[in-house]
Amino acid sequence: MKRTTYIMLAVFLGGFVMAGIFCMILLSNPRGRDRNKIYNIGGPAVTLSISEPFSRIVFDDTSDDGDYHIKVGFAVEMSDSVSAPCLRTTYEWQKLLTTAVAGDTLNVAFNLDNLVDSLRMAEDDSHPYLSSEEFWGITVIIPRGMTLRGVDGRQRLVMLKNFNGGSVEVQTNRCALSVRNCTLDSIIVPKLGVPKLSVDSSTVNYVRIPLGEDDLKVDCKDASGLIKRMEVRGVNKVKAKNRGDLNLADANISTLVWSPAPTDSVRTLDLRIKDGMEIICNNQ
């Protein structure tokens, strides 16, 4: 056989093999399968009573296991209209949530066992997205005067609303924190930092946030948002990046304290501020 004939046969066989592989891919993921389908979770408002006392809240988020992507904000609100704690959500979210008090901690978690049945998912749905019709779709409401020491949102964006006095420790897994209509003595973020802190119609006397693997932007919507003193701390992490970005151009902060850690790997700090902000470098 001529050389050109061999080449033509090779091209034909190669095309045949590629066509077979393509068909196998189509068969393994047919059009009928919903890959990354978005489920909008909503329904009428529902309020669930919480009878046992607590001083900390943990959103025990076990949903990010590679199979589900759940997008809903977690809010904690202080209110004069309730005499006991409760959880406000929607009818469809309520079917997916469990609440339990252990010691001084209220645990709010997704009940993944009910997920497929409640949403009537097809068994072959791949990596579905659950999106809340209301952005802050899950809210724990506590009576005014109740002491709340800590909130751990895990994978959730966290909002504090209508707090009047007191100090709160807030932990998120590198998710944004929003403060709305609050007057607080202090907000402490103990471990992982937050990429964004939004302060709206609120005054916070003292904020402490670590700056390590994430940059930080602080945003005050207008003059009604004020942080009197904010301390940004470096971290002792080998894997932390050498350069940190601290954007305070839209923040109303009276005094900024930068406290690098003794072995802080954030060697260069890119800082953007407003005029008139006092800056203190607290070398430890």
Language-model regions: role of each:
Residues 49-53, 80, 142, 181, ...:
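Flexible, charged surface loops at secondary-structure boundaries
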Residues 64-66, 77-92, 145-147, 166-169, ...:
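Extracellular beta-helix/beta-solenoid repeat scaffolds
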Residues 56-58, 107, 139, 169, ...:
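Beta-strand secondary-structure signal
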Residues 92, 96-190, 194-199, 206, ...:
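Right-handed parallel beta-helix
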Residues 2-12, 19-94, 113-142, 154-159:
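Short acidic/polar N-terminal linker immediately downstream of export determinants
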Residues 198-284:
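Short, surface-exposed interaction patches in beta-rich subdomains
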